[in-house]
Every structure is written in structure tokens, then in C-alpha cells.
Amino acid sequence: AEANCMFPAMFARWFLENSKAFQEKGAKFIHNAPYILAHLAGLSAEEMFIDWGAMSGWGLGYNVYTKEWSKEQLDLLKLDMKYMPKIVKPWDIIGKLTEEAAEETGLPAGIPICAGAGDTMQSMIGSGILEAGHAVDVAGTCSMFCVSTDGIVPELSRKGSGLIFNSGTLPGTYFYWGFIRTGGLALRWYK
């Protein structure tokens, strides 16, 4: 897919260039799910994380095969590595529920908190897509069509394809997906 403002890496670059507050006090770029989990576990800014599936959703700035940030791509994007959270496996335990969070949630303090994975990655597993060569149509808030592969497929990665390449939740799983932003949500309007 072509780089556009939808990719978190592009937003991060814009934000870093245009937010005086982040320039002065910002520590890491993270998604909402790791932010919430980190607060439940009482993690510091330096302990922030992102799972490899959500990380691959950045679209730019990472190496999908090594599951590491790509210094070369981040340099091209003018994003300093210091702003990138550590990359973890979706099943890694990132901490334990704090006493304060236990009081607020009603859950027992000290229970382990797992990093988790993105909704699209998990929907692939939930649909039974565990190996290459399968597809699923998802009618969630967005309407998506996902196809599992063994890795990057040049024909699907060409400019203008409208497809995004991602790591799956499980090791060695990959998929392409395209979406329409109002797909499934439009069913509410139709009703």
C-alpha cells in the first residue's frame, strides 16, 4: 500500500514535527491498547511496548520478518528510535495488575497482564485462518477482506493495490488486507 496519513508512522512523524508538547515531554509512540494495559500494570514510559502484529500495522518503520524496528526506515521517516516502544510477542506477560487498578476494576491485584494482539490479527485466528492460502471477509465497523500468505507477495505489494501487509499473531503467519472504512457500520444505517 502507499504511505498515507493512516499509517501510524506517518502520523508519528507529523506529530513529532508539529506538537510542541510532545517535543518537550513525549517519551514513546504507542497505541491505545498498550497504553491502557501499561497503566493497569503501572509501567513507566520507558517500559512501553507494542506487540509484533500491531507493530506491523505501522506500515512503515519495521522489519516484518525479524519483528524489529528498522533503523533504516525510521531514519528515512525522520523518527528517532528512542520514541519507539519495545516490541513484544502477543502472549508476553508485560506486568501484573496494580493494587490501584484492582480497586478500580474489581479484579484481583497481581494477576498477570498479557500484551495481547490487534483485532484484525485475532479475527484471523478466530476465523480459523492458521496457514497460508486462506481468506476471510470481515464485516466489522470496517469491512475487510484478508488473505493469508507465507510472506510478502510482490504482486499484492505493488503501488496502488490498496492492500496492507501484516504479521499475524502466531509466528510465521502473515496476511494482506484491504478495507472500506464504513463497511460493517453501514449496516446500522441500513437497518
Predicted regions and their residues:
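Gly/Ser/Thr-rich active-site cleft segment
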Residues: 2-118
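Catalytic phosphate/nucleotide-handling subdomain of diverse soluble enzymes
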Residues: 103, 107, 111-191
